[in-house]
Every structure is written in C-alpha cells, then in structure tokens.
Amino acid sequence: GDTATFLAFNLSDEGTAEKFQQALSAGGVDTVCYKKNAWHYAMNWEHFLAQSTANSKKFPFTNPMNNRTVQYNRRDIPQADDLLGRTLVMGINIRMPEERLATIRQAIEKAADVL
C-alpha cells in the first residue's frame, strides 16, 4: 500500500509461488496470491466481465463515437495474469511486535529453503 503496509514476493512462476505460500503458511505467515484477490484484480471483477455499469449508455463498454461494443475476457491480459499469479502479498502491521517479526523472518527463511 501507499503507506508501506504490504510486502510482496515475486516468484519465478505460479507453482513456485504456491509452494512458497504453503511453506510460509506452515510457518504461521499468511499471504494472498494477487491473481486470486477478488477485489484488486480486474479479471476477478464479475461486474466488469458482465459489463455492468451505472451509466445508462453502458459506457465504458459501448462507445457512442463508433457504435462498437468493447469485450473483455479473462485471457486478455496474459502478462498481468503471469505476474500476478506469481505474486504473494503479506500485510505488514507498522506496530508489529518483535516476536512476530522473528516468526515472519523464520518462516521466510524456511520457505526459501523449499525453493
């Protein structure tokens, strides 16, 4: 976030990210795969994919300038799918106790060994 409250791990591929995530979880550290994040990833926005809009002219999904309909598909942004599929995000509490930091550090070290 813009207040440095998240730490992101970018792994080499989705499979590696899943292994790393499982290892972190086993060490007591929760992460979220950004591609699976329902709110912050456009391809998970059901209202977006269904072209739901409050605009009576269906803008931005229709363009009154050329009468074309814009179509969006989950496969339209493969580079984003790749990058976000291998990105794990962990929340950081700015007042995190030293004990929690130690737990996170140990979990990261053990998870790195799995790779």
Stretches found by the model and what they are:
Residues E14-Q21, M96-T103:
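Short, conserved charged micro-motifs
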Residues A107-V114:
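C-terminal alpha-helix
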Residues Q79-L101:
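C-terminal helical cap and adjacent loop that interface with cofactors, partners, or active-site loops
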Residues L11, G15, G28-T31:
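Alpha-helix capping/termination and helix-coil
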Residues F9-D13, I92-I94:
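Short beta-strand-to-loop capping motifs
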Residues Q21-T87:
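Conserved PLP cofactor-binding pocket of PLP-dependent enzymes
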Residues G1-N10:
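Conserved glycine-rich beta-strand-loop-beta hairpin in the small C-terminal domain of fold type I
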